[in-house]
Amino acid sequence: MTPQVIQNLIPEIYQKELEDTLFKLPFYYSSSIGYDEKSIKSYGTKFLDNIGFSHSLIMDGNVDSNYWFLFKPILYFLSQEIKLPVVNVIRARLRLTFQHPERKNFIFNKPHVDLPNYDNYKTLILYLNDSDGETFIFDKYYNKFEASGSVLKDIDKKIIFKQTP
């Protein structure tokens, strides 16, 4: 499936409110910006395993933040746009990624699978502010132990929505 890009998913005034709120929330350090620090390692590609900070809104289907109410309306705009209901939210998080001083020596940040223990889900990526780089979407990953590098799992189950700041 080709990622779907939706420009201006949320109204500008709502986007501004979310941006203003971001830096009032508690963010927590992570030594790896992938799904978790134990995610599958990538081999043969020059990638950056960058640090970051995140704030969990929903984890394993449960509300994990007192601020979820502020971000939940994004799903209403999404449902209206794609003309499908959002039935379940497995995980929602806010992420702050920093420019690594050696970023020009790398092609992209560490590849990862958003929810490696789940099947048949969609991913929403919403940028609330300007990003200095591209988002790379991969449709498969490889196991380092496979000599041929054949595909282990197809992860092309995502729809990507980009909010133009």
What are the residue ranges of the model-derived segments?
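Catalytic core of non-heme Fe(II) oxygenases with the double-stranded beta-helix
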Residues: 65-165
